[in-house]
Amino acid sequence: MITLAVDIGGTKISAALISDDGSFLLKKQISTPHERCPDEMTGALRLLVSEMKGTAERFAVASTGIINNGVLTALNPDNLGGLKEYPLKNIMEDITGLNGSVINDAQAAAWAEYTVLPKEICDMVFITVSTGVGGGIVVNRKLLTGVSGLAGHVGHILSGVTDTECGCGRRGCVEAVSSGRAIMGAAKNKLAGYSTKYIFELARQGYKEAEFLTERSASTIAELIVSLKLLLDCQVVVVGGSVGLADGYVQKVSKHLSIYSEICNVMLFPAYFRSDSGLIGATLWDRDCIT
């Protein structure tokens, strides 16, 4: 079976045709529309999959935001143009003429990453640090989605940094400190206006303000991991996302984790599937749903 997989993120939307053995037959990518207009998202999706839908037998979508019975709502209005009650599953059915499923992107990525962990692992957490911060949780070998799709939104757990305002309306969320958007937003003076990628490059060159921003991001993620370890007793944490997969970022997080009690130790890995975790996870989840 060939699946049309789509991953909707805060910055880009990816689509791929994925075969039964997990091979990518074709992959495309476009920028995520940020206008507060559902028609913009629908138009972008229609354009992206137009040349792929005829080859696929099902669709599988992973998207940032809350997915509740196929309906998408952005928890943080700064993401996806603040989409609310967007009937993503129905729209994909209309666009493609196919049946399929929709799941949160970090939940999907967690499921993909869990499948390649050693068989003895039954509890894990995936954290994506990208435009925003999200997560997916596997407990007793089962993915937690929650009664309303909210499970795993770890980016909106409070951090120890209280002077940052999050788009969700709270102050001090992990997302408001560690995400790519937060790093860019906090950049001042000579760093103002630079991309997160360039700020990381400046940090590697020893630029002090850049070092502070990237270290604060990593230390806040480490603090989050400790909290999740205490709550879930997870065996493994996998980190993904454009920031999470930046050169040296997981090592920074590991360094900050080392200051905590040994009881909070957890195995820490970068995402095996890199930026494709969401696409692969959505596909695997969809196939599990129909078997």
Swiss-Prot record:
A molecular function (GO) term: N-acylmannosamine kinase activity
InterPro entries with a match to the protein in the record: ATPase_NBD (IPR043129), ManNAc_kinase_bac (IPR023945), ROK (IPR000600), ROK_cs (IPR049874)
Entry keyword annotation includes Glycoprotein: no
EC annotation from Swiss-Prot or TrEMBL: 2.7.1.60
Pathways involved: Amino-sugar metabolism; N-acetylneuraminate degradation; D-fructose 6-phosphate from N-acetylneuraminate: step 2/5
Keywords for this protein: ATP-binding, Carbohydrate metabolism, Kinase, Metal-binding, Nucleotide-binding, Transferase, Zinc
GO biological process, one term: N-acetylneuraminate catabolic process
Enzyme class: transferase
Annotated residues for binding of Zn(2+): 156, 166, 168, 173
Reaction(s) this enzyme catalyzes, per UniProt: an N-acyl-D-mannosamine + ATP = an N-acyl-D-mannosamine 6-phosphate + ADP + H(+)
Positions that bind ATP: 5-12, 132-139
Superkingdom per UniProt: Bacteria
Pfam families: ROK
Role: Catalyzes the phosphorylation of N-acetylmannosamine (ManNAc) to ManNAc-6-P.
Membership in a protein family: Belongs to the ROK (NagC/XylR) family. NanK subfamily.
NCBIfam families: PRK05082.1 (NF003461)
HAMAP family xref list: ManNAc_kinase
Complex formation: Homodimer.
Protein name from the UniProt record: N-acetylmannosamine kinase
